[in-house]
């Protein structure tokens, strides 16, 4: 039952190559139609993110050359340009790879949770495209169970290891319920956008975005249902903010001690948290001298991040142990399918034998033969035919001298040691 995981990721391929092999959402259904039309492809799921493009598939044969050729053809890229960056795992390694990817163990940021959501979406799209049947369905269901176990039983996602995530986690430590907090974000770059996404995940209802140009801020306003202001308007809004997170490219501080003093007075000294993740700093260091002010710099966050990286490495080792056990469980299920097929065939053969003998017996009765004789002959022939192959197997096994196999065969036939 050949299972494969093939593709490229941030570890094996440049951004330029990953862009060429990425599947845009509007082309995915066409891609599935073409992929599933390949003679050897039984089932397939395409996972395409900014950091990886992978195909998880169930094939008729024991190599994935046809899928690789299709991938090159679909994206119009020459084979020799893709192969050096391509990995192709089969069976145990393929199962392990999907489990590790879903748990964030193969991500650029160790343990990041977004990849699981992306895999779930990819699986849903594959089902929509008729790319999923029994084997891949079970594979991915098992994958989601593994990822849930890893998240529940380890601390893989509990410790922030990105500046943006660390900033939000720090805010949550100081203001335990962020859903009651007002947040001012200063800047509109990638880091602030990521901070905004994490804040939304924590149900922060009131976000204001301050930026030098309103046009860039407006893009985030729509994304986060926020309010936009210019940097010059910050003094008028600062007192309303409980949490201020700043990340701009300004060469000079944007917030000074005097501005914060006035805001504190207007707030009647209710605490304020300032997180400055800009270099050079956006907030004057003297702000930390004020009472009821918590000021953290990017260096403070880096210290937290380094500690958390070590904690995640420990959690990753625990996750690998869980994954190893789950691989064994899934492979056992796959192996059990072989028995299911054998049982089905054995039953079909037995039923066919029964039907043939019944038809002969019925014909004999219609020809006027004695019912008792017909039944005796039916029972005799049925018994002989049913025990014929097991008897041959017992004889051959006994002659081979393989006692373990003989015991196994006897147990399968329901024979006790005394028989």
Curated annotation (Swiss-Prot):
It comes from the Bacteria. This is Glutamyl-tRNA reductase. The record marks 97 as: Important for activity. NADP(+) binds at residues 187-192. The lineage of its organism: Bacteria, Pseudomonadati, Pseudomonadota, Gammaproteobacteria, Alteromonadales. Pathway: Porphyrin-containing compound metabolism; protoporphyrin-IX biosynthesis; 5-aminolevulinate from L-glutamyl-tRNA(Glu): step 1/2. Belongs to the glutamyl-tRNA reductase family. Substrate binds at residues 49-52, 107, 112-114, 118. Catalyzes the NADPH-dependent reduction of glutamyl-tRNA(Glu) to glutamate 1-semialdehyde (GSA). InterPro entries: 4pyrrol_synth_GluRdtase, 4pyrrol_synth_GluRdtase_dimer, 4pyrrol_synth_GluRdtase_N, GluRdtase_CS, GluRdtase_dimer_dom_sf, GluRdtase_N_sf, NAD(P)-bd_dom_sf, Shikm_DH/Glu-tRNA_Rdtase. One of its GO terms (molecular function) is glutamyl-tRNA reductase activity. Its EC number is 1.2.1.70. It catalyses: (S)-4-amino-5-oxopentanoate + tRNA(Glu) + NADP(+) = L-glutamyl-tRNA(Glu) + NADPH + H(+). It comes from Psychromonas ingrahamii (strain DSM 17664 / CCUG 51855 / 37). Possesses an unusual extended V-shaped dimeric structure with each monomer consisting of three distinct domains arranged along a curved 'spinal' alpha-helix. The N-terminal catalytic domain specifically recognizes the glutamate moiety of the substrate. The second domain is the NADPH-binding domain, and the third C-terminal domain is responsible for dimerization. HAMAP family: Glu_tRNA_reductase. One of its GO terms (biological process) is protoporphyrinogen IX biosynthetic process from glutamate.
């Amino acid at each position: 039952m050949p299972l494969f995981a093939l593709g490229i990721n941030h570890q094996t391929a440049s951004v330029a190559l990953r862009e060429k092999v990425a599947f845009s959402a509007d082309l995915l259904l066409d891609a599935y139609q073409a992929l599933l039309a390949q003679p050897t492809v039984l089932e397939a799921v395409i996972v395409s993110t900014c950091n990886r493009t992978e195909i998880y598939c169930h094939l008729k044969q024991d190599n994935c050359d046809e899928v690789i050729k299709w991938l090159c053809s679909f994206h119009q890229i020459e084979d020799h340009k893709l192969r050096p960056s391509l990995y192709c795992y089969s069976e145990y390694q393929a199962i392990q790879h999907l489990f590790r990817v879903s748990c964030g163990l193969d991500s650029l940021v160790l343990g990041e949770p977004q990849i699981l959501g992306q895999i779930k979406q990819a699986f849903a799209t594959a089902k929509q495209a008729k790319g999923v049947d029994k084997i891949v369905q079970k594979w991915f269901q098992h994958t989601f169970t593994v990822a849930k176990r890893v998240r529940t039983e380890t601390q893989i996602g509990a410790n922030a290891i990105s500046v943006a995530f660390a900033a939000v986690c720090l805010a949550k430590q100081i203001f335990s319920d962020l859903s009651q907090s007002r947040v001012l974000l200063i800047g509109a770059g990638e880091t602030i956008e990521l901070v905004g996404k994490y804040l939304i995940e924590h149900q922060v209802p009131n976000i204001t975005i301050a930026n030098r140009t309103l046009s860039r801020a407006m893009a985030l306003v729509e994304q986060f249902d926020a309010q936009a202001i210019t940097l010059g308007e910050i003094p008028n809004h600062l007192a309303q903010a409980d949490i201020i997170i700043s990340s701009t490219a300004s060469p000079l501080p944007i917030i000074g001690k005097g501005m914060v003093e006035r805001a504190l007075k207007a707030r009647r000294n209710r605490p304020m948290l300032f997180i400055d993740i800009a270099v050079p700093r956006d907030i004057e260091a003297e702000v930390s001298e004020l009472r009821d002010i918590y000021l953290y710099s990017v260096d403070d966050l880096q210290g937290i991040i380094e500690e958390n990286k070590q904690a995640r490495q420990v959690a990753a080792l625990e996750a690998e142990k869980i994954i190893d056990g789950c691989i064994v469980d899934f492979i056992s299920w796959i192996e059990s399918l072989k028995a299911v097929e054998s049982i089905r065939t054995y039953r079909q053969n037995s039923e066919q034998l029964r039907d043939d003998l019944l038809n002969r017996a019925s014909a004999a009765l219609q020809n006027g033969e004695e019912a008792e004789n017909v039944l005796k002959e039916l029972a005799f022939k049925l018994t002989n035919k049913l025990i014929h192959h097991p008897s041959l197997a017992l004889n051959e096994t006994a002659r081979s001298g393989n006692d373990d196999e003989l015991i196994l065969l006897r147990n399968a036939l329901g024979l006790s040691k005394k028989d």
